[in-house]
Amino acid sequence: MNKKICVLAGPASKDLAKNVSKILNAELIDVELKIFPDGESKIKIDGDLDGKFAIIVQSTYPPVDAHLMQSLFMVSKAKKMGASVCATIPYLAYARQDKEFLKGEAVSMELVGSLFNSSGAKYVITVDVHSQMALSYFKVQAYNVSAVPLLANYFKSQKLFQPLAVSPDAGGSARAKEFAKVVGTSSIALPKVRDKKTGEVKIDPDAPELKAAIGRDVILIDDMISTGGSIIKATEVLVKVGCKKVFVACTHPLLLNGALDKIMDAGASEVVGTNTVPSQVSKVDVAPAICDQVSKL
């Protein structure tokens, strides 16, 4: 990277942007935000970007649409100010709707991708994106980095009893395996079934996979926790089969509608997330993973 690097602190991710700038030893540029009475956002970039490589850090957690539009405003303005732009979206909203699951559904991620393509971004970086297919809608160079090793190192230092990494479903088995490799243990995936229309989650407590969890400390690992339905159900089942302790780890702790209290009430000993989404459980910093990818651009 020949250009001078600067980091723009998006309104949704100021602390994370500060951490990124420290690791890169880069100039930190503040972004002013004004919200009008009707909900519109106005963005003002307080710095000179001409000829610089600008890393814009802005997650799109709730309010999703406001944070998404603010990100697009920053990318567009930074480009017009003469910067080469890397849109860093630690939590990328709309990645779940990456195809038409039911007839008539809008493919939200397709439009989100096209908006960043046309806004002026040269690169896009996400962290543990919900769907790899989501990245295919970016026509610019898009990279997804994993926070799993950072989460795993947190738990590796906790001196757990015969730890076992557990994915709440088969779709996350690769994530659990990655986590287990860092911790130095094994992993399993729970046989979860979700009704596409009602969203109801079911896990068979008599499934043979669960035998491996008896008497051990288990770490439920997922990419995101929204309302926590899957994690709550998984925690209840793991407690029922006789685990020693149940810990919950996720990259994106959205924790909506009282999810954290519900998870703890289900029997979890601790919930740990990263700072892609600021929360009371955001104990792991993803800045090192982001900076590692930036250094490769």
Set out the residue ranges of the language-model regions.
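PRPP-associated nucleotide enzymes
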Residues: 1-297
